[in-house]
Amino acid sequence: MIKNTIAIVNDSEVTTGSLPDGIISINAWEVDWDNLSLDDTYIILGGHMGSYDDKKFTYLQKEKQWLKKAINSDTKILGICLGSQLIADAVGGTAFLSDKIEFGFKDLNFVEEDPLFDDFKNSKVFSWHRDTFEIPPGATLIAKTEYPQIYKIKNTTALQFHPEIKLELFEAWYDSELSKQELESYDVKSEVNYLKDNFKQLEKSMINFYSKWISANSL
């Protein structure tokens, strides 16, 4: 059976970026969560909200309920940024607001070896988040910075950073006055220049990772 790869869009400004073509994007606030198939492959994208903002963004409640069911059914899932936080919340971890923003390109500190992520050893990864999480029971932490960055649980892979980053995405996220205010103490220009200068390597690392992830046998 041929499976679809479906990206769940939690925020209209946080799209698939430099992920490969052929991914079907659907908006989380329009999903019929009660009838969403467990047999396809899913990418849970990021967003400006927190996992705990589910009273304001009520679709997050149903999304987390579906994620719990899907993870326990060994549905193949990749969570990115908010996606990694929703996954943690769904299966016994805790997503929460940290005391500061993590912004910019960072080196990962690997605490477990897993060849799936080897390409992220060769380049920095981009983070922009204030929310973080405690990984859920039964999960394996693979890499971290000051915060957890990669973990796996069952057939689910979670990344706090943004492997899909590209200049157009960054510009969309940075466009608001709120974003400019929260980053006023950071050297944003330097990070943008790094993105421009290293995009080919960043994209290569992401594509190599994605190819290994999408082709890996499900549990």
Where are these regions (language model features)?
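Hydrophobic/aromatic beta-strand patches that form the interior of the parallel beta-sheet core
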Residues: 6-7, 24-26, 43, 78, ...
